[in-house]
Structures are given as structure tokens and as C-alpha cells.
């Protein structure tokens, strides 16, 4: 009997995909698993690389269908009670995925479990957050970092390491490694397809919470994750624009247009404050000043993103490929 379906979506990430697939057998530790790789019209040899791995079923899309739609393809039509949405820029250690599947069965209220993510250098990669809200935006945007410690930081998960150092329910988790209970989805596809990429993980976690399921962080299970391999290639630093557009769409759908516009107003003001601080810091010399100048350019580019939502509401998402050739 099939115990788990593993879905991976690749777009021009063949080298990372090869390492990820090479690690799967040991990571699944004997589980009866189906492995499906959906290639989103890559310009590299992702599909060929995937086909070299034994037991991997490869689906090749003629056009880039976006991450959510492609992952839904990968996880569809299976009797498996557990579904794993896995990014190709992860390299799961031996037994890691098997342990996460076991946690799904051990926690009857868990609709989704996720590991603690690590950067390639072994440092913590923050991956779980509070749901977007006006209080969180105010605290994170305007309270000085040195004051985001202790009880305040713990409450809003702003303090480094919190809550990544313990196993507990969380609000939402980025989608690098999602281990899902199929029965928690109510017959629906896992991911919302309104956006080409980004915030589908936020929408899924919100949906699970609203239907009575928990999202669990399993902090004692660690998986390395490069992060934004496809997004960086597609949009560069402008991926932040895509992220914010998709996030506003989800917040509007869940909390309403008025809340989304108010959230945009807080984000706009906070971005302006941070931009001013970065401009001051960029007046010095050295690498730190160069980083601040780059960050200032990014922040400046985000002002109209937040401003448009505040002024006219959340725009209709256009699932268009970027000019760099994502298609």
C-alpha cells in the first residue's frame, strides 16, 4: 500500500534537483512512496536528470503553470494518506522525511507538519511566522530591533530562534517542506493557484486553521534548504514584489479588502521609515554601506507596491511570467 506521495516542482534547477532526488531514498527510510517530479518547461535538463532516478515519475509541462498548479499536479490522484510537497533546493537527511510522516500519524490534530529549516551553512533559516495582522505589522515595522526581545519578541515570534527551538503548533510555515495529511484537505487541492508563485503556503495554512487543523513545527527534525532558487532566477530582487502582491491577495481573501488596505498603509509607513534608516547608514564606507544602498533600492521599489494597495485596493493577480523568460 502506498504510504506517501512526494511531489517536486522544478524550473531550471537540475543540479539541485539531482541532489534532492539522490537523497530521497534514505530520507524516506523504507516507506512505500510514489515520487512525482513536474518540470515547468525548464530550459535546462531538469526532466532528463529526474528521469535518471529510479522510481521517479516525470511530468513535463509545455508551459510554466506556476508553482501551485504544478505541485497540485504532482500530488493529485493518489491513495496515499500523506502528501509531501518538497522543494528541489532541499536535501533531506537520512530518515528525516520518514520521521515527519510518523509525526503526522502521531498527532491526530495535525493537518501539516514541517521541519526546522537550515541554511546551507548550517545556521537557522527562519521558516514559521505569525499570520499577517495589523498588530504584527506595527510591532515588526516600528519597534526598534533591540526592543524586539523578551516577552514582546516571544509573543510575536520576532526574537531570533523563537519558536524554532521547540516542537509546537504554529500559524504558518513556508512551503519548502510540507508534509500534509491528505484527509485534512477536504477533497481540495493543497495549493491555491491564483498566483504564479508565492503565498500559496500562507493560504494553505490559513485554510487548515479555519477548518480546525493544526500546523506543527517539528524542531528536532532539520532539513537544509537553499531558498528561492527558482524565484531568484526568475525575478531577482524583484521577487519581493511578487511575494507582496500574492500576500495581499491572500490577506484580502481571508480578512477582507479593508484589512488588506489598512495592512498596506502600515507596511508603506514602515517601509518609508526603514528606507530613511538605510539611507543614513549608506552614507558610510565599506561593505556594510553597499549592502544598505542595495537594501534602500529594494525598499524604494516597494513603496508603490504598498501604496497602490492602500490607494485603490488589492489588484487582481496577473499570473504573468517575468521578463527574464519564465514561461
Regions found by a protein language model. Name each.
Residues 163-166, 171-222:
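A short, conserved alpha-helix in the catalytic core of glycosyltransferases
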Residues 93-127:
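Conserved donor NDP-sugar-binding/catalytic core segment of glycosyltransferases
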Residues 23, 39-47, 63, 93:
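A conserved acidic beta->alpha catalytic loop
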Residues 83:
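Short aromatic/hydrophobic "clamp" motif used to bind/position activated sugar donors
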Residues 238-246, 257-327:
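Non-catalytic, C-terminal membrane-associated alpha-helical segments of glycosyltransferases
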Residues 23-32:
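Short, acidic, metal-binding catalytic loop of nucleotide-sugar glycosyltransferases
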Residues 132-170:
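Short, flexible, basic/aromatic active-site loop/helix in glycosyltransferases
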Residues 60-78, 88:
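Glycine-rich, basic loop-to-helix element that forms the pyrophosphate-binding segment
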Amino acid at each position: 500500500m502506498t504510504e506517501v506521495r512526494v511531489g517536486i516542482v522544478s524550473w531550471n534547477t537540475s543540479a539541485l534537483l539531482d541532489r534532492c532526488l539522490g537523497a530521497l531514498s534514505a530520507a524516506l527510510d523504507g516507506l512505500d512512496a510514489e515520487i512525482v517530479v513536474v518540470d515547468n518547461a525548464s530550459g535546462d535538463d531538469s526532466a532528463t536528470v529526474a528521469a535518471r532516478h529510479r522510481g521517479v515519475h516525470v511530468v513535463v509541462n509545455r508551459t510554466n503553470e506556476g508553482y501551485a498548479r504544478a505541485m497540485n499536479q504532482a500530488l493529485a490522484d493518489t491513495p496515499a494518506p500523506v502528501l509531501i510537497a518538497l522543494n528541489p533546493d532541499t536535501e533531506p537527511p537520512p530518515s528525516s522525511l520518514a520521521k515527519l510522516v510518523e509525526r503526522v500519524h502521531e498527532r491526530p490534530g495535525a493537518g501539516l507538519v514541517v521541519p526546522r529549516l537550515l541554511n546551507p551553512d548550517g545556521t537557522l533559516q527562519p521558516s514559521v511566522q505569525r499570520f499577517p495582522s495589523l498588530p504584527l505589522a506595527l510591532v515588526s515595522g516600528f519597534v526598534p530591533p533591540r526592543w524586539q526581545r523578551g516577552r514582546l519578541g516571544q509573543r510575536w515570534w520576532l526574537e531570533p530562534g523563537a519558536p524554532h527551538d521547540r516542537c509546537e503548533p504554529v500559524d504558518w510555515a513556508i512551503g519548502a517542506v510540507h508534509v500534509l495529511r491528505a484527509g485534512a484537505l477536504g477533497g481540495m487541492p493543497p495549493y491555491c493557484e491564483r498566483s504564479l508563485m508565492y503565498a500559496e503556503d500562507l493560504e494553505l495554512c490559513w485554510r487548515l486553521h479555519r477548518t480546525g487543523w493544526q500546523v506543527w513545527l517539528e524542531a528536532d527534525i532539520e532539513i537544509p534548504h537553499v531558498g528561492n532558487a527558482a524565484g531568484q532566477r526568475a525575478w531577482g530582487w524583484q521577487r519581493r514584489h511578487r511575494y507582496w502582491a500574492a500576500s495581499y491577495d491572500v490577506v484580502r481573501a481571508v480578512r477582507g479588502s479593508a484589512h488588506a488596505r489598512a495592512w498596506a498603509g502600515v507596511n508603506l509607513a514602515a517601509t518609508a521609515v526603514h528606507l530613511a534608516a538605510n539611507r543614513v547608514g549608506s552614507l558610510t564606507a565599506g561593505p556594510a554601506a553597499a549592502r544598505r544602498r542595495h537594501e534602500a533600492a529594494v525598499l524604494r521599489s516597494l513603496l508603490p507596491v504598498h501604496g497602490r494597495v492602500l490607494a485603490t485596493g488589492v489588484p487582481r493577480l496577473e499570473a504573468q511570467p517575468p521578463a527574464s523568460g519564465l514561461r
